[in-house]
Amino acid sequence: MNKVAVLNNVKKDYFSRQDLLSSALDLYGDYTNTQLRYLVSKYIEHGEIIRVGHNCYAKAKVIKGKKTYSNQLSEEAKEVISQVEKAYPFINFQVWELRWLNDFVNHLLARNIIFLDVENDGCEFVYSSLSEKFPGKILLRPTTKEMTYYSTDNAVLIERLVSESPANSENIHIASIEKIIVDLFANKTLMTMVSKGDYADILENIFSKYQVDEKKMFRYARRRNKEAEIREYINNNTDIKLISED
């Protein structure tokens, strides 16, 4: 069995295990699931394919040059994480920073905001604790008017952490790029800070530079009731080719 031939016979750059099985059956007429599992493991081991989502793989040539997204936390954000971990070691929360979007936009955002999403039962407790440590810097579920009057550079915005919010693979308290993409459409406060005219550039730059797990992204988008809107925006306003249109 020629595993190179099986992979080359898959016409799509992004494919499922079923696509690989269909390719093998097309070439050899008989192929078992056990053989398929072995084949997939060898492709991954040799760097010929990369897993990009649940039952979704990409040929290595497509992903080559794309990195796993990560960014540097500001000292202020590090201190926020440290304080929450110390006061509430068992609470679920995620952090990311507005300035990270400057990597993807033409019009740089002038100030930084630290987004802190906390599991619902813990929002008020975390707000009280951080307000003592950072007086005047903490806002709990702020309205647009409150943001205008009370937010400062490096202000901390506390919102409810929605279930299934995808975290960074290396740190569960840092938001993943998939969460950030969805929040651009779901977080009303964030939407007042970033021009919708910059969204196409942001999304195209993210997808061209970094690996994006679409399954994870759209699962979270469904939790925010934004899946259809995000799909429509990407399809109508960008050159991004989504892996799955399901």
Question: How would you label these PLM feature ranges?
Answer:
Residues 58, 115-117, 157-159:
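Residues in well-ordered beta-strands of folded domains
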Residues 35-38, 121, 125, 172, ...:
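Short, well-structured alpha-helical interface segments that form or flank functional binding sites
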Residues 53, 120, 186-188:
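Short, flexible beta-strand-to-coil junctions
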Residues 55, 71-151:
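Short gly/ser-rich loop at a beta-strand->alpha-helix junction or flexible surface loop bordering the NTP-binding
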Residues 10, 29, 116, 167, ...:
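Short, charged/polar micro-motifs that form catalytic or ligand-binding hotspots
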Residues 8-87, 107-109:
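Short beta-edge/loop segments at beta->alpha junctions of small alpha/beta modules
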Residues 4, 134-246:
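Hydrophobic alpha-helical interaction segments
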